[in-house]
Regions:
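Sec-dependent bacterial lipoprotein signal peptides
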Residues: 1-21
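Long, intrinsically disordered, low-complexity segments
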Residues: 22-24, 118-119, 190-192, 215-216, ...
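An aromatic- and glycine-enriched ligand-binding surface/loop that stacks and positions planar moieties
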Residues: 24-91, 196-197, 218-381
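Conserved, well-structured interaction surfaces
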Residues: 44-63, 88-165, 177-189, 195-210, ...
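Flexible, polar/acidic helix-loop-strand segments at domain edges
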Residues: 90-102, 107, 349-428
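Short coil/turn linking the two alpha-helices of tandem helical-hairpin repeats
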Residues: 162-164, 169, 206, 234-243, ...
Length: 549
C-alpha cells in the first residue's frame, strides 16, 4: 500500500467532508483565521461532533462509492446467489462468485475502490482519536459517547476488512510508513478493544429507541454489544483461536444485556421489515400506498443500520445506497419492484430448501414466474440480456417503482434509479441478537429460537447448535450474514455448501450452467483478492492471499 498517498488523499477527503479546507501559507508567519486544519480544528466539542460525522460518512462511503461493496461481495460469494448481471458484461463478478480469476484474468483490482474507502474511513477515526486530548469537552458524558462511537466505527471498518481479506495493514495512528499486513489476531485484538471501549463508554440511554426518529443510525452501547458477539463467533469459528479476555461468557452476557434492555423486539410480521415485501402499487407521489405495511426505518427490531440519502449525483456527492441498483431485476420494472442490473440472481437450490409454510420465503425472494412478472412488458428483452437468470431475485433490497415504472427513489418521481437508492442497510436486527444468544448457550436458548420460528409460521424445534445455525440461514438470507456464518463453521464446510456441480441457468436466453468448485474456495480459504495495484504500490510489501497469486 502507498501509505503516503493514502494519507494525503484521505486527509483531503476528511477535511472536505467536514466542510473544511486545508490552509498553507508558506511565507506568512500567521495562522488562518477563517479556515480549519488539523492544528486549529480539534478544539471544541462541536468540532468533535463534526469530526464524528466525518467518521460516520467514511463508513458510509464504503457503500456509497462505486465498488463491489461488502454487501454484494458477501452475497455473491455465498450459497444463496449467483453473480448474474448482463450477458455481455465483464465477468469480474463471476471471479468473485466462483473464486476463480480465470473467469476474467485481467481483473486484478476488483476491490481497489473498496480497499481505499475502508482505509479512508479508518484514517478519519484515527485522526479524531489522535486529537481527542486537545478538545475542550462540555461534559464527560458527551466526551465518552462521541469517542465510543468513533472507536466502534473503526472496529466495524476493520471487521469488514479482515473478513474480506484476512491479514491486512493495521493502522491505529497516521503514518507514512509502508506498513505490512498484520496477523488477523492483531487486527481482531483492536476490533475487540474498540468495541469494548464503546460498550464501556457509550451510556445505555445515549440514543433511546423511543427517539429513533432523531437517533436512527447512531451506534449505541447495545449495537456495540451485538457486534462484539458477532465478531467473537466469527473469530473463534473461522480461526479456531481465542484472545485473552475475549470469552464466550462475555459475548453471551452482552447479547443478554441487549435483550434485557427491552429496547428492542421482533416486528410482528416478517415481511414488514422490508420495503419491497410490504409495498403497495402506487401512483407517483403516493407515499402512503407505496410504503404499505412497512414497519419503517429504525423500527423496533433494528439494532444498527447504515443510513443513506437520495441526493447522490455524479458530481462527487456520495451518500446513497450505491449497491441497491445491483439487486434490482435486469432493466425490468414490475411494480412495486424497480429495475436494476440483475446481480445476485437467487440460487434455485436455496429457494427450494425452505421449509413448507415458511413466511420468510415470500418476503425475501421475488418469484418472477409465480408473481406474473414473466408476462410483464419488457420481460423478454430483460431475459435476453440477463446472465445467470434463475427466475428468482432478492426482494429484501429490491429498488421500488411506481405503477407506471417510474423509479420511487424520490416520491415525486424525479430521482435517478442508478445512483439515488437509499434503503437502509440493516446490519444488526434483534432476531440476530436472539439467535446469537441461543448459539452462545443462553439458558433461554429454546425460548429465543421459538420466538424467531414462531414469527416465521414454523413449529418449535430443539435448540441445538445445528438447528440454530440452520435457522440463521433463512432468517438472514440476503443480509450479508450467511456467507460469514458458513465460513465460521470451517472453510471445508463452507466450500461444500457453496459449491455447485452445474446448476442450470439461462444466459442471454440460452442454456448455461454455474459451476463453483470446492477446490477453488478451499484454495482461497474463502478470502478475497487483494488489489494488485496496492501490492505494486507497496513494493510487494503486501502479500497476495493464497490461491489468488
Amino acid at each position: 500500500m502507498n501509505m503516503k498517498s493514502m494519507k494525503i488523499k484521505t486527509l483531503a477527503v476528511s477535511l472536505l467532508t467536514l466542510g473544511m479546507t486545508a490552509c498553507s501559507d508558506s511565507f506568512l508567519d500567521t495562522a488562518s483565521k477563517t479556515e480549519s486544519n488539523t492544528e486549529s480544528f480539534y478544539k471544541t466539542q462541536n468540532d468533535a461532533k463534526r469530526a464524528l460525522i466525518g467518521c460516520y460518512d467514511g463508513w458510509r462511503q464504503t457503500s456509497s462509492n462505486p465498488g463491489i461493496g461488502f454487501f454484494v461481495a458477501s452475497e455473491v460469494m455465498g450459497a444463496e446467489c449467483f453473480a448474474g448481471l448482463g450477458n455481455t458484461d465483464a465477468r469480474n463478478y463471476q471471479v468473485i462468485d466462483r473464486f476463480d480469476i480465470a473467469q476474467s484474468s485481467s481483473d486484478l483490482n476488483i476491490y481497489e475502490s473498496d480497499w481505499a474507502r475502508y482505509y479512508e474511513g479508518i484514517y478519519r477515526c484515527n485522526e479524531l482519536i489522535k486529537y481527542e486530548g486537545q478538545i475542550a469537552w462540555d461534559s464527560d458524558a458527551a466526551h465518552k459517547t462521541c469517542m465510543g462511537e468513533c472507536h466502534a466505527l473503526r472496529a466495524i471498518l476493520y471487521f469488514d476488512l479482515v473478513r474480506l481479506f484476512g491479514n491486512v495493514p493495521l493502522l491505529t495512528v497516521a503514518t507514512q510508513e509502508n506498513v505490512p499486513q498484520s496477523p488477523a489476531a492483531d487486527v481482531y485484538q483492536v476490533i475487540f478493544d474498540d468495541l469494548q471501549y464503546a460498550i464501556d463508554n457509550i451510556p445505555a440511554d445515549a440514543y433511546p429507541k423511543a427517539k429513533s426518529s432523531e437517533n436512527d443510525g447512531r451506534i449505541t452501547k447495545y449495537a456495540a454489544e451485538a457486534l462484539y458477539a458477532r465478531a467473537y463467533l466469527f473469530y473463534t469459528g473461522y480461526y479456531g483461536a481465542s484472545i485473552e479476555s475475549v470469552t464466550k461468557e462475555k459475548a453471551l452476557s452482552y447479547v443478554e444485556d441487549v435483550i434485557s434492555s427491552k429496547e428492542y423486539d421482533l416486528v410482528a410480521d416478517y415481511k414488514n421489515l422490508w420495503p419491497a415485501a410490504s409495498a403497495g402499487i402506487a401512483k407517483v407521489g403516493d407515499a402512503k400506498t407505496l410504503l404499505g405495511t412497512y414497519a419503517g426505518d429504525g423500527n423496533i427490531e433494528t439494532v444498527l443500520s447504515m443510513k443513506y440519502t437520495n441526493t447522490q449525483d455524479y458530481n462527487g456527492n456520495n451518500d446513497s445506497n450505491r449497491w441497491q441498483v445491483m439487486v434490482g431485476m435486469r432493466s425490468l420494472t414490475a411494480a412495486p419492484y424497480g429495475k436494476g442490473w440483475g446481480c445476485m440472481t437467487v440460487n434455485p437450490q436455496f429457494v427450494n430448501s425452505y421449509e413448507a409454510n415458511d413466511k420468510r420465503k415470500e418476503a425475501s425472494i421475488i418469484d418472477i414466474v409465480n408473481e406474473g412478472i414473466a408476462e410483464a412488458e419488457g420481460f423478454e428483452d430483460s431475459y435476453g440480456d440477463w446472465r445467470e437468470y434463475t427466475g428468482y431475485c432478492v426482494k429484501k433490497y429490491s429498488p421500488l417503482c411506481f405503477a407506471d415504472g417510474t423509479s420511487a427513489v424520490k416520491i415525486d418521481g424525479s430521482g435517478g434509479f442508478q445512483e439515488q437508492n437509499h434503503q437502509d442497510w440493516v446490519i444488526v436486527r434483534y432476531a440476530d441478537v436472539l439467535l446469537m444468544a441461543a448459539e452462545l448457550g443462553s439458558p433461554k436458548a429454546q425460548e429465543y429460537l421459538d420466538q424467531v420460528r414462531s414469527r416465521a409460521g414454523l413449529a418449535s424445534v430443539a435448540a441445538t447448535q445445528a438447528n440454530i445455525l440452520k435457522e440463521r440461514k433463512y432468517e438472514f438470507a440476503f443480509e450479508a450474514i450467511n456467507y460469514w456464518d458458513l465460513l465460521r463453521q470451517g472453510v471445508d464446510y463452507a466450500a461444500k455448501q457453496i459449491a455447485t456441480s452445474g446448476i442450470a441457468v439461462k444466459s442471454g436466453g440460452l442454456d448455461d450452467k454455474v459451476v463453483i468448485t470446492e477446490q477453488n474456495i478451499k484454495a482461497k480459504k474463502g478470502l478475497c483478492q487483494i488489489p494488485q495495484n496496492q501490492i505494486t504500490l507497496s513494493n510487494n510489501i503486501l502479500v497476495q492471499n493464497d490461491g489468488w497469486k
